[in-house]
Amino acid sequence: PVHQGGLRSELLAMTMQQVYEKINDTGEMFSENAADVIAAVERKELSRLQKSQIHANFAYIEPDDSYFDLTFRREYKRRAFDAVFRHLDTRSMFGKGPRVGAGVWFDENREAKGGRTLAGVAYIPGASALCAEDGLVYGNKWADARPEGKVGDIGPWLALAAQLIPDPVERAHILNVMAYKRQHPSVKINHAILLIGDPGIGKDSFYAPFLYSIGGRAQRNAHIAKGDEFSSQFTYGLENEVIVLNELRQPEGKDRRAMENHLKPIIAAPPDTLTIERKGLHPYDMVNRMFVLAFTNDPVPLSLPSQDRRWFCVWSHAPRMDKDAARALWTWYKKQGGLEAVGRWLMDRNVSAFNPAAMPPWTDYRSRLIE
């Protein structure tokens, strides 16, 4: 899509950084209440808006009768919009000027205040707050949450990588995938990564810095999917740059084939768009730029066709991580700058030779999954 002029990217980045700095670090990586903490901070920021600033910070979404926050890229239904700004003295410009909800006041003054109307919303990684297609303007729900990171020693993480994936070619490919996604949010990596191994060997620990590099400690723009999530009527989980499939497995052969078919449009493009079904709101088509990462302990979690081009599959024979080693690694991650150092390394890694559209390299383990 063609990008329309919206908020200046440097001002948006500065505002978002100021907000993130107000979030207290609890020391918990991806804690369950992280989203609640961020939402509370955002509500506090909204309450500080003056009435004169609202039209510059919001746009009206026509099909949903709702309002789009151009800073935090969130959608508010009319009732929620009224509630958030109920503290403001919003009065109608008609009659004797009775007090009205913030939504009505916004609508009445939209033209005079230079407010925007949108044809809908979108989720387009790498794009600005306002995007256009076929002459229509959309509000982009994606906002860059990548931390800058800090240059430092990443030896503990590279040691874990070598332990999990001893083959240097396979390991280099996975590192390139992570670095490319960190550096290029607007580009689809047209295959998924599947890492198989025994429980407790450090699969989650290995990929944690990558997820941090995409969305910070709050893990924005990354989603850990539940087992039956993609069979749900609503598909909010697709509104992410990275989708993690934990414990990928289907015991029956027919179910393994069905799952592989179900994941095809998510893993690779085309299709160039995916439909997001939303409760109480109109569905919309998001741009298919997500990357899929899967873990499993099952030696045969899915069945692949002989012509498969969508999966890079690695079997790790690493032993279970020692508890003290795991504790030391996570202490380094959370308290000694490990997450920031790995995130920065991924940002700086040279991936100029990596082709995100190419078929992934063949692995011995992938041949075992082919029917």
Residues covered by each model-derived region:
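Signature of the SF2 helicase/ATPase Hel1-core->accessory helical subdomain module
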Residues: 264-271, 300, 318, 346
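Conserved AAA+/SF3 P-loop NTPase catalytic/coupling segment centered on the Walker-B
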Residues: 241-268, 301-307
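N-terminal nucleic-acid engagement/recognition segments and initiation subdomains in replication
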Residues: 2-170, 186, 235-238, 300, ...
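Conserved catalytic/switch belt of AAA+ P-loop NTPases
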Residues: 215, 258-284
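AAA+/SF3 P-loop NTPase mechanochemical coupling elements
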Residues: 232-238, 276-295
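Conserved nucleotide-binding/hydrolysis micro-motifs of P-loop NTPases
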Residues: 249-250, 297-301, 317-322
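P-loop NTPase catalytic core of nucleic-acid-dependent motor ATPases
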Residues: 127-248, 259-260, 312-315, 346
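Phosphate-sensing "switch" segment of ASCE/P-loop ATPases
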Residues: 285-290, 304-371
